[in-house]
A protein has these predicted regions:
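Short, ordered beta-strand-loop transition motifs
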Residues: 36-45, 95-97
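Conserved catalytic and ligand/cofactor-coordination microenvironments
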Residues: 55, 73, 86
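Domain-scale recognition of soluble eukaryotic interaction modules
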Residues: 1-19, 25-26, 51, 64, ...
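Proline-anchored loop/turn motifs at beta-strand termini and strand-loop-strand connectors
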Residues: 70-79
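Conserved, non-catalytic sequence blocks in retroelement Pol enzymes and Pol-derived host proteins
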Residues: 37-42, 55-59, 110-115
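Eukaryotic beta-rich interaction modules
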Residues: 27-34, 44-51
Length: 162
């Protein structure tokens, strides 16, 4: 973070909360979670890139993925938009080929107590629980018809075993 104060288009509680979360992720990163250098050097807190590595002894062991977090002024009372980005989007039954993630804590089960760190851990746990590398059965149709914002999708959470 270079000790510089981050500039942001966010106000008040969102800025303070994000500064605190970023500081924690930079100084005390969890295994498999690293804030990208791009985020650490950014002048705006509304967009983060977080690099995650597939957990040991899982189908995704050692694979590197990037998550995009988009925050607005309602954070932490409203969830961020979280998607996989880049060339390596995991083939997982709850991850669409456009990077959208079907995970209830990103929408209906969001709580202000959740953090970027806890969201990343939940996503890594989701990856770790996979029993096969495959796209969701409706991937083609969903990707063709969905909004760019996954929070606008009407998710149907029905399968916690993959």
């Amino acid at each position: 973070m270079n000790g510089e104060q981050k500039k942001s288009t966010l106000l008040g509680p969102a800025v303070r909360r994000l500064q605190k979360e970023l500081q924690r992720l930079v100084t005390s990163p969890a295994d498999g979670i690293k804030v990208s250098d791009e985020t650490c050097n950014a002048s705006d807190l509304t967009s983060w890139k977080v690099d995650v590595t597939g957990p040991k002894e899982t189908l995704f062991e050692g694979e590197n993925f990037q998550l995009s977090f988009q925050f607005d002024e309602k954070y932490p009372f409203d969830s961020p938009i979280v998607t996989f980005t880049g060339d390596n989007i995991p083939k997982h039954p709850h991850v669409y080929s456009n990077g959208h993630i079907c995970l209830s804590i990103l929408t209906t089960d969001w709580s202000p107590a959740l953090t970027v760190h806890s969201v990343c851990l939940s996503i890594l746990s989701m990856l770790a629980s996979a029993t096969k590398k495959a796209r969701p059965p409706d991937n083609f149709l969903y990707v063709k018809t969905c909004s760019k914002n996954p929070k606008k999708s009407s998710w149907w959470y029905h399968d916690d075993k993959v």
